[in-house]
Amino acid sequence: MIEIDNGGAIALKGFNYQKASIILVMIHNFEKDNFIVIPESQEDFEIHLGQDTYFIQVKGTKKLSIGKLKSRPSGKASIIEKNLSPGNVGDIRKIFLWDIAELTKNELISQEGTLIPMKHSLSLKQKTEIINTLDLDEEQKNRMNNQYIYITPFPNDINLALTFLKGEMVNENLLVSNDRAKLVLGELSLEIDRKSEIVVSTESDVERKKIDGNYLKQVFINIKQKEMFDEILDNLSINTIMKKKVKKEKLRIPLLYQNIKEQTKQKADINLLMRENDEGAINYLRDLLVEIVPDMKPTELSIALAIDCFCELGE
C-alpha cells in the first residue's frame, strides 16, 4: 500500500476543533461588555472580557495526561509552558481539550467558570509534579495559579461539534431553529478563518484580527431578521414566483437601496405600523416608499424593501 501523508488532514481536523471551541466561547459571552476574540495570536486564541485577558490553547489529542502536558517533545516547550508564556502574570490561561486520561481527570479540582460553565484547576500534587519536572521559576509558578483546564462538551469531530453548537444556540434562545443556527455557524467559521489568516508583524495587525461583540451581535440580528423576512413574505398573498423574485431583490438592498430604506424607517409611524397585520404593514411601508421615491413602482423590489424595513423596525 502506498504510504500517505495525513499531516494536512490532521492539521485541518485540529483547526476545526479549535474553531468549534472559539464559537462555543462566543455563544456564551458575545453579549457581555467589551468581549473580543483574537484567533491565532499569542495563543491558539485570545479572549478579552472586561478587564481580563485569557490565553487559550486547544488540544485535540486523545487521552491527554499530566505526563503529556509537561512533556517536552524534541526539547521544545511543553503544552503547559507554552500556555504560561504570553501576557502578564495576572492573565488567565486555559487549555481546552476533549479527552483526558482518567487518573489525571480524577485529580483535577472542578470549579465554576467565567467564560464557560465549568473549569478545572490542577491539584497541588499535579502542580508540584509539573514544577519539579519543568523546573519552573517563581514567575511561571505564579502564572500557573491562573491556569485551568476545560473539557469541551464535544469531541474532536467537526460534525458532532457543529450538532452540539447548533443545539446550544437554540437552548440559549439565540435562534429558534437549527437551520438558522447552521447559517450563523457558517458565518462565524468563515470570519474566524479570515482573521486567522492575518499574519501579525505590527500592533495594527493584531487590531485587524479582532472579532468583537458588536460584530457577533450583528450576525445574530441579521440571521433573526432573515428568518422574520421569510415568515412575513410567506404571509403575503402573492404567488410563489413573486416570492422568489422578492427574495432575489432583497440581495440588492445592502448595495443599492440602503439610503432609501433608512429614509422609510424614519418616516414610518411605529404605533400605526404595529396595529396592522403583515399585509397591511407592508402595504403601508410601500406607500411610504412611493412618497420618498415617486417613480418606485409596485414591484418585487418595493415588497422586499418594505419587508426589510418592517423587520428592522420590529427589533
Curated annotation (Swiss-Prot):
InterPro entries: Cap4-like_endonuclease_dom. Keywords: Antiviral defense. Disruption phenotype: When this gene is missing the Lamassu type I system does not confer resistance to SpBeta in B.subtilis. The keyword Cell inner membrane does not apply. One of its GO terms (molecular function) is nuclease activity. GO terms for biological process: defense response to virus. It comes from the Bacteria. Component of antiviral defense system Lamassu type I, composed of LmuA and LmuB. Expression of Lamassu type I in B.subtilis (strain BEST7003) confers resistance to phages phi3T, SpBeta and SPR. This is Lamassu protein LmuA. It comes from Bacillus sp. (strain NCIM 5461 / CCTCC AB 2011126 / NIO-1130).
